[in-house]
Amino acid sequence: MPKSGLKCPVSSFFLLILYSVKTENMKILILNGPNLNLLGIREKSIYGETSFEEYLSGLRDFYTMVEIDYYQSNVEGELINKIHEVGFSYDGIILNAGAYTHTSIAIADAISAIPCPVIEVHISNTAKRETFRHVSFLTPVCR
């Protein structure tokens, strides 16, 4: 749990990466897809009231030995470009592709094309939401 006391949806995934890869001088990208720039103000009953900037600050405070970069885009091609850009040099990507999770073969192909481990995360429980959110094109290629 980050020092700020915030419940962070990606903190347990950080621990997984930290203990499965290495613990010093790690470089991780948190990559968020469409509408995640609205965390804290969008559908608070589903996504909560905490902005991603607050989560990110807590993660950086807690995981001081890790270089944490962050990128968010509402544009599919920009997410793919970022995966290509960092996928050969970073230690891991934590990806919340938002709605692209359920639609994007192109993002799945981008993940398949890189050696960097990618972990798929979501803030809400997609299995308990609309039926179309139960399918992920990304899960089979994440590692």
Region spans (language model):
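Short acidic/histidine-rich motifs immediately flanking catalytic phosphotransfer sites
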Residues: 86-93
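Short, glycine-/small-residue-rich phosphate/pyrophosphate-handling segment
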Residues: 128-143
